[in-house]
Amino acid sequence: MNGRVDYLVTEEEINLTRGPSGLGFNIVGGTDQQYVSNDSGIFVSRIKENGAAALDGRLQEGDKILSVNGQDLKNLLHQDAVDLFRNAGYAVSLRVQHRLQVQNGPIGPQGEGEPSGIPIAMVLVPVFALTMVAAWAFMRYRQRL
């Protein structure tokens, strides 16, 4: 592993119907409350259990909301974004950016000829120690003869 974290970024249109608890999620971010360094976007901070977003299942905590009913959320104060969501109506269309962390390394069984991931020293040191003990025991045995 090289210590780098890679992300796969995808966008999706999600249509939600407002329920008794609203759209069923909380937001963070905005130009006055940056949630992500160098990004003043609006992000999902919490999905409410049994809310519209949870029942739909596609919106996830950490998703960036790009637009609400076609209105861009760039460069908005947090409260302006909250007001936009509150006044969005009964049927709400969200343009969302998902950031999925990509695993840095193999995800399945390793093929033939691929390294096992065990450092060679973890194998060689015990083998070397065992060889030394065997050599010492052999030398002691020969001295007795």
UniProtKB/Swiss-Prot annotation:
Keyword GTP-binding: no
Free-text function comment from the UniProt entry: Regulates endocytosis of activin type 2 receptor kinases through the Ral/RALBP1-dependent pathway and may be involved in suppression of activin-induced signal transduction.
One Pfam family this sequence matches: PDZ
Keyword annotations of the record: Cytoplasm, Endocytosis, Membrane, Mitochondrion, Mitochondrion outer membrane, Signal-anchor, Transmembrane, Transmembrane helix
Top-level taxonomic group: Eukaryota
Assembly with partners or alone: Binds (via the PDZ domain) to isoform 2A of SYNJ2 (via the unique motif in the C-terminus). Interacts (via C-terminus) with RALBP1. Interacts (via PDZ domain) with ACVR2A (via C-terminus) and ACVR2B (via C-terminus). Forms a ternary complex with ACVR2A and RALBP1. Interacts with MAPK12. Interacts with DLL1; enhances DLL1 protein stability, and promotes notch signaling in endothelial cells.
GO BP term, pick one: negative regulation of angiogenesis
Membrane topology, from the record: Single-pass type IV membrane protein
Mitochondrial intermembrane side: 139-145
Cellular component terms (Gene Ontology): mitochondrial outer membrane; perinuclear region of cytoplasm
Name of the molecule in the record: Synaptojanin-2-binding protein
Cytoplasmic side: 1-117
Gene3D superfamilies to which the protein is assigned, alphabetical: 2.30.42.10
Keyword set includes Nucleotide-binding: no
Residues annotated as domain PDZ: 13-100
Location relative to the cell: Mitochondrion outer membrane; Cytoplasm, Perinuclear region
Ranges that cross the membrane: 118-138
